[in-house]
Amino acid sequence: MNKVRINILSPGRFHVCDLARELDKNGFDVKFYSFVPTKRAMKFGLPKHCSASIFFLMFPFLGICKLFSRSFKLRRLRINVQDYVTGFIMRRADVMIAMSGDFVYAPKKAKQKGSLIIYERGSKHILEQRRVLESIPYFSKSKPVPDINVVRELKSYQLADYIAIPSKHVYESFMEHTYPKERLFVNPYGVDLSDFYPIRDMEKRYDVIMVGGWSYRKGCDLIIEAIRLTGLSFLHVGGLVDIPFPEEKGFTHVGIVDQKQLVHYYNQAKIFLLPSREEGLAMVQAQAIACNLPLVGSSDSGAEDLQQMVELPEFITIIENYTADAVVSALHTAMMNYEQLQGRIYAGNAIKELTWEAYGKRYATFLNRIITEKKM
């Protein structure tokens, strides 16, 4: 019996590299088309036979984009070129999985040849995402979501047979824009438990940690206010995006580090904080849970979904609104939760549902169902 052929299209690694690896384990014939070099993809567990890297074909465009990193037009050119290049070289497949907004030509071509088209959408419906971001005062005089991005996203939604999304609030945003619910597949992202785990007896040098881009989108302006109000010690690990990092007592910044080093930073803190205003399901939250840090998240960070995936959901606190006072209140709750942990692993055996293996099995079950339905 021939294996089901699946092409996965992505500009970079993202979570779909993990998806490609897991679908290969589940018996599918997978090809991962991206500009990630094969050797780098293999470092994240992708088998060599799954990689269909177009790095060398894209190298001139990647180089130009790096030289002129602030040019939006060049970034759009790179996206369009990759879309067409992938469309020309990709093999025929039963299913194509593509990152939304990045690919339109290639999926359209694949659909003409009989492929089922699944788009991966990591954030809210593009119109809702634009509304949320435009409501942030910092973006009042700019366009946080360019019109061309909206156009390509909406084309993706029309072209899709299904859209895979990571959380309840993303699902609700599509419902608000009357997207057919039977074409939505909710599947929370996973975490690699070999990279993230509690380290016993490690000194807790910080009260609070946040990992990820330092930005208004992730609520970092609220973090600054809340840390000043509470006097807690704070560690940030990641890049600086659109908010200056405070150079004052109580605030420590570390730049971007290799994923395998992150566990040592998580374990130096007591609790994890992410009051994100708009994010599908921030994977750093699952990483923090795997390290057994009580979590403070938002209704728009995917934290509510994670509450349903641990044995002791009370150790995940959701901020009531996007104000510094609400973050302060949630921090107090989380700090009390930390004191009550007393060595317990609050995810319990349910941590298995937060792994990439579980994510891949849920996806495999979904694929087998829709492929069977197509044949009927």
Short names for language-model regions:
Residues 61-73, 116-151:
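Acceptor-binding helix/loop patch of EC 2.4 sugar-transfer enzymes
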Residues 83-92, 104-106, 125, 139-163:
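Membrane-proximal helix-turn-helix segments that form the acceptor-binding/catalytic region
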Residues 157, 264-269:
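Short alpha-helical donor nucleotide-sugar binding micro-motif in glycosyltransferases
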Residues 277:
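Aromatic "clamp/platform" in nucleotide-sugar-dependent glycosyltransferases that forms part
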Residues 294-299:
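Short hydrophobic beta-strand element within catalytic cores of glycosyltransferases
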